[in-house]
Amino acid sequence: MRPRLIALPLLLSLAAAAPHRPAAPAAAADGAGNRMAAFPPMSLPRPGDRPDPFVMHCSAEHWCARMAQDQTGRGWSIGVGHGAGMPMRADIEEGDEESEFAIWPHIVIEAGGAVLVGVEARRSTGYAGGGASGTRLILYRAEAGGGALHPVLDLPIGAAKDIRACFDSADRRHRLGACSDQYEFDGMLTLDPATRTGRPHFIYAARARTYPGRRSTDSDSTTAPPLRRSDLRWWTDPGCTYSRRFAFDPRENGYVPDRPLPACTDYLDF
């Protein structure tokens, strides 16, 4: 049986005993000395097994984090520890239908010693002939000397929908065999290399697309004109393919974008 609760002394000892690893080749840094590095799991799942949400993740700098559940099996939390220091813990505010959680496989190490550790929260739903899923990233900030662990950024990093569009042979002919409307959204968070002082700034790049051709959840595919061969391609949605710069705002006690994010409900709402 997998452990669902992790005691603070256990997290403390695992953090202190974490093996030293070289920095990941993909690590990035900005001009202020903030870095993004790999935050891998201490053990990998066997082939064919699902990833264990309770596995410990540790960095080369001896920062470690692990997910835990309460005794009811419903409430989730994250514990973060550094070396022999006192571990920190924060409850995760779960969204509707979120049932899968995992540690983000990257860690941001600030020049001043604090770190940002992420949790990926996933929700999904199924319906006749299709389904939808979405993942958001929640970043938590931890000080090297201990103290409160609190969320500072919450962003969508992935979403997908597959909606049935064929219900008989006529539909299959009209759709040229493309019998589902597909929606994809991907978001990536990286350090802003232009940052010269202070806390890290981030670049968030989002890309959204639909298939076949331009699709919208506001329209009924069964009443749309027949597809053409030229429609059998992915269409990049310019309204939901964008970039934003996030900076820390002390008044909000979190990161805010330089411009509002579009809603992109076709991809993110279900």
Residue ranges and their predicted role:
Residues 20-50, 57, 134, 142-270:
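Acidic, small-residue rich beta-repeat scaffolds with periodic aromatic anchors
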Residues 1-8:
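Bacterial N-terminal signal peptides that target proteins for export
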Residues 61-125:
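Short N-terminal edge-element motif at the start of the domain
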Residues 75-82, 137-139, 243-245:
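Hydrophobic beta-strand positions in blades of beta-propellers and related beta-sheet-rich domains
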Residues 66-70, 126-132, 232-238:
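Short consensus segments that form the blades of beta-propeller domains
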Residues 10-18:
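Hydrophobic h-region of N-terminal signal peptides that target proteins for export
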Residues 122-135, 183:
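His-enriched metal-coordination microenvironments in redox/metal-binding proteins
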Residues 48-68:
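Beta-strand-rich domains and repeat architectures in extracellular enzymes and scaffolds
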